Amino acid sequence: MIDLYTWSTPNGRKISILLEELKIDYKVTSINIMRNEQFSESFLKISPNNKIPAIVDRSNDDYTLFESGAILIYLAEKTGKLLNSNNKEEYYRTLEWLMFQMANVGPMFGLSLIHI
């Protein structure tokens, strides 16, 4: 079971989409960033940089992880799906596109929320 701490942002949505695709059981806790809930003491224990999304993997000794890219890689490797670590070229090509999305495409989607 994964506990997902998130809000309705592009980065937050990425994780729930992957959890659904991988058919991993999860529970969502909304962290309302418009009300500064990301600065609560309880959330800081999960995400020390005050950012969403973050997860707690209850099946792995309550392992915590923040940053969408790190979470996506963790979930893909945890299930053995989507990342083919047996083929290093394919593995790194996938990571290359993930990093491109995180550095270039993702921020543009996030900026669009400022005007809403």
Which residues make up each language-model segment?
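GST-like domain detector, emphasizing the conserved glutathione-binding G-site
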Residues: 1-113
